[in-house]
Amino acid sequence: LTVVFVLGESLRPDHLGLNGYERNTTPLLSKEDIISFKNIHTEYTYTNRSLPHILTRADSLNPDRAFTEESFVSLFNSCNYYTVWLANQESAKSYAYFMHECDSLFYANIEKSSYVFDKWVDESLFPLFDSALKSAADKKLIILHTIGSHWWYNSHYTDSFAGYQPVTKSKIISSCTKEEMINSYDNTVLYTDYFIHSLIGKLRNERAILVYLSDHGEALGEDGIWLHASQSPVTQQTAGMVWMSASYKADYPQKYEKAMQKRDKKMRTDFLFHSLLDAGGIDSQYKDYTLSIFR
């Protein structure tokens, strides 16, 4: 069994064609059997705070768990999963501990910085992902931490995904038009569509489930606010989706049905910890399956 968790970056649910956005920013995923959740709320709107919250049992009533408990990775380890973290973002103090809970940790684009203009794209993770999939372990948990739709948008998609024009030409936001900002952002969404679809292609013949959750949303000019790390409501709405291979679905038809029923349900990111344990069939005193999207 292979459980894949894709940790997204700055992806808004309302900019996905899958969710009814006026632009078809998800031409590839729209052809797949994707369960997309339109109503996920995140407490924190920047990576350093949201990640510890997402990876652990922390919730709004017990936020300290993000710093006093281990993540779901340790529970997968204890159930004989081979666990691997594939990083396309540098580690930060607030979540480095969780990365090192994994059996293996690999970086793509280790020297990249958001201050440069060259390409820093998620397909750099593909060779690492292919290697992890080839591991001899019967049970695998593969975590991919993506750069996704982080600002400077233009460096996070390849030229063939620059479908929406004109795009931003300056890193000084005040000298960009709203149209350019949204076009550049939507091109990152087109690229994320390609990235997730490519992972699905590699998992199609496996007994596998892929869960995607972005760390937070992104402000695109609402109330004059741009990017994230603000309490703007759009930055607290985040994208999430699930894909199951045919053999996984055949083994767990009820998980598929239950997740389908929750597409429009209001949820907090608290669901992730418990849902991943559920997806991997992990029994633990820490699980609360009432929070699982598969129940």
Q: How should these model regions be labeled?
A:
Residues 1-295:
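Catalytic domains that recognize anionic headgroups
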